[in-house]
């Protein structure tokens, strides 16, 4: 099982893993998934699955603060409604000043500007009925370091700053992920997937 932000969703293909190594897996990576999202997705998955190994992308663990709240909440919105989603909403809105608990508990409020345009897909998304036919894998094309010259990204970018402060909230949920894995006798593998937004400042 793979958990984390979009970089892992686009990097690890469960079909290829099965075809080449015979390993069954699922990718639960979601764009801008904060560590609190990784923790609650792990809890949600363990309701029905018993993985031997969980691979966790730690890119967001090093953030000083969450990025745009609208992007970060996608991790929440994809989850099927239930106890874990409710707890996710309560804890996330307590740690993020941009987050409105009402909009998390009643997500249709975010569609108020286009009620007449809503389709079946919108309702399936809100109700958590969307299905992934790629087992969570996001098929993306080549990423370029410079879109004007089409210079392909080739390694970690240098940065003058030596150390990046850490986010206490992310550290807290990282520890909860470790504890949850121990409770369920699951091995954890922490990885940092290569991406063009990574640099020595974040790495340190």
What are these regions, as identified by a protein language model?
Residues 3, 7-92:
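Membrane-embedded segments
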Residues 5, 169, 202-203:
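Short amphipathic alpha-helical interaction segments
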Residues 20-24, 154-161, 192:
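Acidic/histidine-rich, surface-exposed loop or edge segments in extracytoplasmic proteins
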Residues 22, 185-187:
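A generic structural signal for alpha->beta connector loops
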Residues 53, 187-189:
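Structural motif
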Residues 59, 192-194:
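Short, well-ordered beta-to-alpha junction loops that form the rim of enzyme active sites
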Residues 71-184:
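Secreted/periplasmic serine-hydrolase-like ester/acetyl group-modifying domain
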Residues 195-204:
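Substrate-gating cap/lid alpha-helix
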């Amino acid at each position: 099982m793979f958990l984390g932000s979009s970089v892992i969703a686009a990097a690890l293909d469960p079909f290829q893993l099965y075809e080449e190594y015979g390993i069954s897996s699922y990718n639960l990576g979601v764009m801008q998934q904060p560590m609190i999202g990784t923790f609650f997705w792990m809890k949600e998955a363990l309701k029905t699955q018993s993985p031997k190994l969980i691979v966790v992308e730690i890119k967001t663990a090093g953030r000083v603060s969450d990025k745009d709240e609208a992007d970060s909440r996608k991790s929440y919105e994809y989850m099927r409604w239930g106890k874990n989603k409710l707890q996710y909403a309560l804890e996330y809105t307590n740690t993020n000043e941009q987050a409105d608990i009402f909009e998390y508990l009643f997500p249709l409020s975010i569609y108020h500007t286009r009620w007449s345009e809503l389709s079946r897909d919108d309702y399936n998304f809100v109700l958590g009925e969307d299905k992934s036919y790629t087992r969570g894998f996001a098929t993306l094309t080549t990423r370029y370091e410079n879109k004007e010259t089409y210079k392909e990204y080739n390694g970690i970018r240098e940065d003058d700053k030596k150390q990046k402060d850490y986010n206490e909230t992310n550290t807290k949920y990282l520890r909860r992920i470790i504890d949850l894995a121990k409770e369920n006798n699951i091995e954890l593998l922490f990885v940092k997937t290569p991406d063009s937004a990574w640099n020595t400042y974040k790495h340190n």
